[in-house]
Amino acid sequence: MVLRNLTAMAIYDQTFVYSSDDALAGMVVSMECLTGLFLLVAVIIGCFRIAALKSPFGILMINQNCAQLMACINSGSFSTLGVLLNIKPVLSISYLFGNFSIFLLPVILISFLLMSFNRFCACFFPLRYQNLFSSSMIRTFIVFNWLLSLVAGSYLVVVRECNFVFYHFGWLFAGSVSVKCGTLLSLYSISIQTVLSITIVGLDVVTLVALMAFRSKVYQSHSVEVRRRELSFSGQVIIQGAVFLCHGAWYDMGHAILPGNDDRWKFFFTTSFSSNLLHVFDPVVVFAFNKEFRRWLFRNFNVPTAQKRIVTVVSAHNT
């Protein structure tokens, strides 16, 4: 696990002079967030338009992607205005952007956990599924998710006076140097991501193995199309959970793997760059694993025929 010397980084920031490297780092993250913005919006619209996703799983997907869209806009706004354009008033309130991202982190992860739990229950408790994921229960799950994250974030920011601030050295957000907060903020973000990611992947693996091993019993009364869709949904959430788990490991240990001696860029690629790349990767996984999304995308956005053939061939190969 890499130890980032926040005190030294704060001292460096006191003599900070804007350079082309700052503009480059800001532009890279801005482009990531802009790409993620369009993809996440497409997923959200698709969830409302596609008949197969007008379901409990689709509602949970909308909740997760809305939370991730908010994180994407938050990060993209700061990177464009503060890092790329070096607007001082924006930089001076970096803690507002950072604290908001800390609040959204558990919302996004718990949303993924709810999606995994949904697939788990659909597989192992089909007779109770409608009760477990009725409209009222889904609303309860979602409200509880946001309230729990709000309470945890409020405790960190208000009670323990923790702030997630921007450092020019490495172009990253990290906890501010505070006696009352200490390392609590770092431990919170790392532990919640690790615990929830492992739980998500564990649920997904159990569900996917059960679907593959007992598909004839689980879906004996369902059509081939329904079986394929359920496997696709399960594959989607297991990949997304695994990516979050790998990202947590990369965040902590990627610094030792990267070549070169410039710690600024090593910090950048293991934190800000990789974190915001998730805004792009997650919706791409959705499109890759869901035939309904691809059909809807091709039909509504006039994707060239050549690209259709390529995706069809890849999809057939994966099948």
From Swiss-Prot:
Keywords: Cell membrane, Cell projection, G-protein coupled receptor, Membrane, Receptor, Transducer, Transmembrane, Transmembrane helix
Annotated knockout phenotype: Insensitivity to ascaroside pheromones.
Gene Ontology CC terms, in alphabetical order: non-motile cilium; perikaryon; plasma membrane
Transmembrane segments: 28-48, 67-87, 95-115, 138-158, 164-184, 194-214, 267-287
Pfam families cross-referenced by the UniProt entry: 7TM_GPCR_Srx
GO MF annotation terms: pheromone receptor activity
Known tissue expression: Expressed in ASI sensory neurons.
The keyword Iron is assigned to this record: no
GO terms classed as biological process: calcium-mediated signaling; cellular response to pheromone; locomotory exploration behavior
Annotated membrane topology: Multi-pass membrane protein
Localization: Cell membrane; Perikaryon; Cell projection, Cilium
Role, per record: Receptor for the ascaroside pheromone icas#9 which suppresses exploratory forgaging behavior. In response to ascaroside icas#9, may furthermore play a role in the expression of genes in the TGF-beta signaling pathway, such as daf-7, and in insulin signaling pathway, such as daf-28, which may in turn contribute to exploratory behavior.
Family: Belongs to the G-protein coupled receptor 1 family.
Protein name (Swiss-Prot/TrEMBL): Serpentine receptor class X-43
Native source species: Caenorhabditis elegans
